[in-house]
From Swiss-Prot:
One of its GO terms (cellular component) is endoplasmic reticulum. The gene is ELO2. It catalyses: a very-long-chain acyl-CoA + malonyl-CoA + H(+) = a very-long-chain 3-oxoacyl-CoA + CO2 + CoA; octadecanoyl-CoA + malonyl-CoA + H(+) = 3-oxoeicosanoyl-CoA + CO2 + CoA; hexadecanoyl-CoA + malonyl-CoA + H(+) = 3-oxooctadecanoyl-CoA + CO2 + CoA; eicosanoyl-CoA + malonyl-CoA + H(+) = 3-oxodocosanoyl-CoA + CO2 + CoA. InterPro entries: ELO_CS (IPR030457), ELO_fam (IPR002076). The chain crosses the membrane at residues 63-83, 97-119, 123-142, 147-169, 201-221, 232-254, 276-296. It comes from the Eukaryota. Its main location: endoplasmic reticulum. It is an enzyme of class 2 (transferase). Keywords: Endoplasmic reticulum, Fatty acid biosynthesis, Fatty acid metabolism, Glycoprotein, Lipid biosynthesis, Lipid metabolism, Membrane, Phosphoprotein, Transferase, Transmembrane, Transmembrane helix. It comes from Saccharomyces cerevisiae (strain ATCC 204508 / S288c). This is Fatty acid elongase 2. Its EC number is 2.3.1.199. A motif (Di-lysine-like motif) lies at residues 344-347. The modification Phosphoserine is found at S336, S338. GO terms for molecular function: fatty acid elongase activity.
Length: 347
């Protein structure tokens, strides 16, 4: 295969020698362009030197939302605003806000894609040179660029609270799954930053990848553009969730066995505080419980409105689990039973 590539690529490189400058390398996997250096330069210029990514250090107490009290205040304020707002606006007409909603989703698509590409650039050499176990369990994978990206992703979690504000203003239903997820994810990111867990890149990069697709879909939908891959938005969320569980349970096992049951087989310790390890495991596990609960409600409790609507939807749970975060079942007509097939009489 390599010889075939060389055979067909050689004439191209002879004709356009400048293409050699864009061959990917381990340190620069995106066309030999250092995304981090360009990002550092652009952000430094835009902020007039107030924020220099390459010089960033996460120091608790010196940065916004870097200690527990303001984090809890922000999350509490989020719940007060959305539930108080829903009560205060209950008798008003729904706001349309389609233009702002499009802008919101376009901004979050761009932010998620930027952070994802920057993170992949940092992770490729770590994983290739040192292996996957090193990347998720060794302190050497807790690098300055990645910590900078982790903190920026953490701040974005609070920006994503605006998702729910739109639901309130548009008089959409607020479900426990949606509201809990936003608050819990912000808290999860805080605990992992404080606990220096090297595995942080796994759930963060997967989540960023899903959010690129999800927010882009919401942007297109707000513009009235239908896409064939709608149901894959939630399938990607489910895949992300399963991978998160696998990686995090592996890391928690390594940590727990190393500390408390060293005679059991394990690879070694996983870096990160015990508090961060078990807090992360608890929050991720709660997502598992919520999804299983939804699944049981749809497929095991026959006859409920949720079950009938979801089962009749194209794609079933995979297409509707995320949509049911926002949909108001009271306003969804109960599907009528499918009519019995009529047979033509033979003459």
């Amino acid at each position: 295969m390599n010889s075939l590539v060389t055979q067909y690529a050689a004439p191209l490189f002879e004709r356009y020698p400048q293409l050699h400058d864009y061959l990917p390398t381990l340190e620069r996997p995106f066309f030999n362009i250092s995304l981090w250096e360009h990002f550092d330069d652009v952000v430094t210029r835009v902020t007039n030197g107030r924020f220099v990514p390459s010089e960033f250090q996460f120091i608790a107490g010196e940065l916004p939302l870097s200690t527990l009290p303001p984090v809890l205040y922000a999350i509490t304020a989020y719940y007060v605003i959305i539930f108080g707002g829903r009560f205060l606006l209950s008798k008003s007409k729904p706001f349309k806000l389609n233009g702002l909603f499009q802008l919101h989703n376009l901004v979050l698509t761009s932010l998620s894609l930027t952070l994802l590409l920057l993170m992949v650039e940092q992770l490729v050499p770590i994983i290739v040179q040192h292996g996957l176990y090193f990347a998720i369990c060794n302190i050497g994978a807790w690098t300055q660029p990645l910590v900078t990206l982790y903190y920026m992703n953490y701040i974005v979690k609070f920006i994503e609270f605006i998702d729910t504000f739109f639901l309130v203003l548009k008089h959409k239903k607020l479900t426990f799954l949606h509201t809990y997820h936003h608050g819990a994810t912000a808290l999860l990111c805080y605990t992992q930053l404080m606990g220096t867990t090297s595995i942080s890149w796994v759930p963060i990069s997967l989540n960023l990848g899903v959010h690129v697709v999800m927010y882009w879909y919401y942007f297109l939908a707000a513009r009235g553009i239908r896409v064939w891959w709608k149901e894959w938005v939630t399938r990607f969320q489910i895949i992300q969730f399963v991978l998160d569980i696998g990686f995090i349970y592996f890391a928690v096992y390594q940590k727990a066995v190393h500390l408390y049951f060293p005679i059991l087989p394990h690879c070694g310790d996983c870096v990160g505080s015990t508090t961060a390890t078990f807090a992360g495991c608890a929050i991720i596990s709660s997502y598992l419980v919520l999804f299983i609960s939804f699944y049981i409600n749809v497929y095991k409790r026959k006859g409920t409105k949720t079950s009938r609507v979801v089962k009749r939807a194209h794609g079933g749970v995979a297409a509707k689990v995320n949509e049911y975060v926002n949909v108001d079942l009271k306003n969804v007509p109960t599907p009528s039973p499918s009519p019995k097939p009529q047979h033509r009489r033979k003459r």
